[in-house]
Structures are given as C-alpha cells and as structure tokens.
C-alpha cells in the first residue's frame, strides 16, 4: 500500500491515495449490492420532505439512533468518591464500551472491572463470578470501596446483588467491614441518567442506612452545611471546580457529593494515580446532617433527591442553569438556604457576562437553533438561547417525558423568542433529521454524534454536550456560573463568526463582507 516506514502518512491523507480509493470502490462493487445512484438519490430527497416527516413521526415500534446510552454507563459516572472501584456484574464487552466512552470524552483513563460473565453464568447464575471478581478487585487494585452494578445479562436472570455481596463477605473474599454499595442498573430500561441516579442513591443509602445491615443506621443531626450534586455532567471537571469557587466566594460550608473533578483529570507528573480525589467517606456520611441538598440536574437525580428529602433535608432541584437568569436563581437559592450574601466579586462577574452578551447580541438575535441532549441540559441551553435573543426552534430529547415537555413549553412561553419553538420528548435523531430538513435552522447544538446531522443536513453544529469525542479538552471548561455562561457564549459566537467567514470567501462576489473586525 501507499504507507511506508520512511514517511508515515496520517489516515486522513492516506485514504485519499489512489490504491485506497480503488480498494474502496472494489469493496462497494463486490460486497454492498448497491442500488443505482439515481435511485438512491431519489430516496434521499424524499426523506427530506414533509410527507416523509409525517410518516417518520408516526413510528411506534422502532427507534432510529436514539440519543441515549444505557444505565450501566451512567452508573460508571457516579464514581466521584475516594478510592472507589466501579464493578459491573456482567460481561467484559460491556465494560470495554463504558471505559472507552469515557476515555474518549475526558481523554483520561477510566478504570472499571467486570465479573466476566459468559454463557455459563448467564444460564446458571453469576454468583461465582461475583465472589471471584470481588476478591480479585480487592486484592489487585486495593480500592477503598467497590461500587457494584449490573448489566442486562445479570438482570435477565435475576441475580441478587445484595445476597451475592453478603455471600462474598461470608466466604472471606472481601472483609466484612469493607464498603460495597450496589445498585441494580438494567440496560433495557431507562438510560444513562437513570443509571447515574440509581448508583448515587445506592451509595448514599449504603452510608446512611447501615451499610446493608452490617452497622446501625446513621441518625440525622442537622447542621448548616449544604450538599451539592452535579448530576450526570460531561463538564464535571470544569463545573465542579467552578462550583467550589462560587461556594468559597460566598463563604458557604458545603459538601460535593460525587466529586469527579480530580477523578477525570489526573496530572501527568510522573506519578500514576489509580484513584484521585473524590468525596471522602466521612464527608458522605456527614452529608446526612446537611441543612439542604442542591442539585444542578434535578431530572437526572429524581430518585436520589427524593431519598434525600425523605431524610428530612430541604432539596433544591435545578435544571442545568446556564446564563444570567439560571446563575441568578442558583446563587439566590444558595444564599437563601445559607443566609450568606452573594459576594461583590460574583456581582462583578454577573456584570461582565451581561456586558459580553450586550457586545455580541447583534450576531445572536433571531438566530434559529436545534438542540439535542439530556433533559436538564436541554432546559439550560434553551433558556440561555432565549436570554440571548435566539430561538431554540427544535429541542429533541430522547429521555424527555411529558413533565419535561411541560417545563420546556413553560420556558418557551416566558419569552417572546419562544414563539414557534417546540419540544420533542421521546424522539430520536432520525426525527430530528426530518425537523431540520422541513423547518431549517441556522445551527445545531449537541454532542459529537450531532456531526452526522451536520453532514447530512448541511447545518453547522456547535459542540456542547456529552460525549464530545472529536474535540479536545472541552470538559475542562465550566458551563455553570457566570464564567461558564461566557464560555458557552464564546463557543456559540465562534461558530457563528466561522460561518460568516466561510460564506464570504468569494473574491469579488461575497468578500465585501469578509471583515477583519466582527
């Protein structure tokens, strides 16, 4: 082939070379049984019509590219506790997917183990796999805690995690006092946000309710602290550090539950850290006594927040607050609970954000957007766009339900820019394709998978969401707080200005607007 050891060519240029192009053509001709190009083109054009959109939206028993992942993946994200080893009772293949998915987003090792279930355990039960797996994980990786969850294989046959863990302790595979919280996370229902919610609740239940009956349940002794839960958040590295800064500026005594900021961002300083950062067990236990718990993504933590409320705490469930209004609401809630005033520094940061929006409003006003993502994320981004004078015309959320749609519609009704905007709960990316072709927008907002809609529809996209596989280091920047809103504003404006430049390149035709100053 064209590759040689003296001059290594990147795949982007390598696959353009004649021998590779010929190979691709031969594969298509020999194996793909392709229809004539004109017939394919006619079919493609028809799928862009209103007629096809009506048929597409009439689907009942088929999903085409749903915008969600499975519960166990979300469960892996709930690992922001000191020295915690995620343990999945299921196959190695499942865990390989979870690890690679997070590796590619955070550009960081994502350690996780499985019980290596195969055909025999799938028929006769996975008890022995669990017993051996816990013993190996404990002795080899030396964690402070092993957090166990399931996959569809273990759930279909009804494996009982609580009983299996107790048996492993009785056999001495792990010490009786060793922390092994668990959650059942079947892959065939819910989504990644459900899995995160189940695991967070499982970990808190373990610490607060007597560690599966091995110690007395904790008794709540209320104090003045505030707990904070970020939810399933692809920007957890930047966001958690920003939230800590905001709490510190207000002199608020707080505990982050599930702090993944260091877990997903270890330094390259010559020391390998299998475990880094995370909420300590003492902090997790003491969190029961907090005055209140504030969650930035209430929809993705419904069970966890309900459990915390049952313990007697005040709970505040927000929806990924981005922008001036969202951050105002968050800080006002924190101030009201803690009795601490919003600091002068934060008031200045608010003013800087307002100034930035005012500077750029002419480029944003009236722009139409299509958004896809998790329920709380969609609410937060749509709210910020309305604040900017933009129009979130299509908001598609596979994990959204009727309650989410009502929240979206109330948000649209709160702004004149929400007129003509629509929320689509339970819809997939093939639905979104029909929406963008029949009612075009100026920009798409979503995760890396949105790029295929960009290629198909010709609508430029802005990378915001989870996962971001094809861009680097976005997760290091916050999107919450006034500074986080500036980051989101810059990402949106950068793409708007890039499109302006691309559309004004024609020498003597469009370059009259190829401006040096925007």
From Swiss-Prot:
Class of enzymatic activity (EC top level): oxidoreductase
CC per GO annotation: molybdenum-iron nitrogenase complex
Family, similarity comment: Belongs to the NifD/NifK/NifE/NifN family.
NCBIfam families for the chain: nifK
Pfam families listed in its UniProt record: DUF3364 (PF11844), Oxidored_nitro (PF00148)
Protein's UniProt name: Nitrogenase molybdenum-iron protein beta chain
Domain of life: Bacteria
Catalyses which reaction(s): N2 + 8 reduced [2Fe-2S]-[ferredoxin] + 16 ATP + 16 H2O = H2 + 8 oxidized [2Fe-2S]-[ferredoxin] + 2 NH4(+) + 16 ADP + 16 phosphate + 6 H(+)
Organism: Acidithiobacillus ferridurans
UniProt entry keywords in alphabetical sequence: ATP-binding, Iron, Iron-sulfur, Metal-binding, Nitrogen fixation, Nucleotide-binding, Oxidoreductase
GO biological process terms on file: nitrogen fixation
Keyword Nucleus among record annotations: no
CDD domains in the cross-refs: Nitrogenase_MoFe_beta (cd01974)
């Amino acid at each position: 082939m064209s590759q040689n050891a003296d001059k290594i060519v990147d795949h982007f240029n390598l696959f353009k070379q004649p021998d590779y192009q010929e190979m691709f053509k031969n594969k298509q001709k020999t194996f793909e049984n392709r229809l004539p190009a004109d017939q394919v083109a006619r079919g493609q054009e028809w799928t862009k019509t209103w007629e096809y959109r009506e048929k597409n939206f009439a689907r009942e028993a088929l999903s085409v590219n749903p915008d969600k992942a499975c519960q166990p993946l979300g469960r892996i994200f709930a690992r922001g506790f000191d020295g915690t080893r995620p343990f999945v009772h299921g196959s190695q293949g499942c865990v390989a997917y979870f690890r690679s998915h997070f590796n590619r987003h955070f550009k960081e090792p994502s350690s996780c183990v499985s019980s290596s279930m195969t055909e025999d355990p799938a028929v006769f039960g996975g008890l022995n796999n669990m017993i051996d797996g816990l013993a190996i994980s404990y002795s080899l990786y030396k964690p402070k805690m092993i957090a166990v969850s399931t996959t569809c294989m273990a759930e279909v046959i009804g494996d009982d995690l609580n009983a299996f863990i107790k048996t492993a302790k009785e056999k001495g595979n792990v010490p009786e006092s060793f922390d092994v919280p668990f959650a059942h996370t079947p892959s065939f229902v819910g989504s990644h946000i459900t899995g995160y919610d189940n695991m967070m609740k499982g970990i808190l239940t373990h610490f607060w309710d007597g560690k599966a009956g091995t110690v007395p349940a904790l008794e709540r002794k209320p104090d003045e602290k505030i707990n904070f839960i970020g939810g399933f958040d692809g920007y957890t590295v930047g966001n958690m550090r920003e939230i800590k800064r905001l709490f510190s500026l207000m002199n608020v005594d707080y505990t982050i539950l599930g702090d993944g900021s260091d877990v997903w961002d270890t330094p390259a300083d010559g020391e390998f850290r299998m475990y880094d950062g995370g909420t300590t067990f003492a902090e997790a236990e003491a969190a029961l006594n907090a005055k209140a718990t504030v969650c930035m993504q209430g929809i993705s933590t419904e069970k966890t927040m309900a459990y915390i409320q049952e313990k007697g705490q005040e709970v505040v469930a927000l929806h990924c607050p981005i922008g001036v209004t969202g951050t105002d609401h968050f800080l006002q809630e924190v101030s009201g609970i803690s009795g601490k005033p919003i600091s002068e520094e934060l008031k200045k940061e608010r003013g800087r954000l307002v100034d930035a929006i005012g500077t750029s409003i002419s480029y944003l006003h009236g722009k139409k957007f299509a958004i896809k993502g998790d329920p709380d994320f969609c609410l937060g981004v749509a709210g910020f766009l309305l604040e900017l004078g933009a129009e979130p015309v299509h908001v598609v959320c596979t994990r959204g339900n009727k309650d989410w749609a009502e929240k979206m519609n109330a948000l649209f009704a709160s702004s004149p820019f929400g007129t003509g905007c629509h929320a689509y709960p339970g819809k997939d990316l093939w639905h979104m394709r029909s929406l963008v072709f029949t009612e075009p927008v100026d920009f798409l907002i979503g995760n890396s998978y949105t790029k295929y809609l960009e290629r198909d529809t010709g609508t430029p996209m802005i990378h915001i969401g989870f996962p971001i596989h094809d861009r680097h280091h976005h997760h290091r920047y916050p999107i919450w707080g006034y500074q986080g809103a500036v980051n989101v504003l810059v990402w949106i404006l950068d793409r708007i200005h890039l499109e302006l430049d691309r559309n004004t390149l024609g020498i003597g035709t469009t370059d009259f607007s190829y401006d040096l100053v925007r």
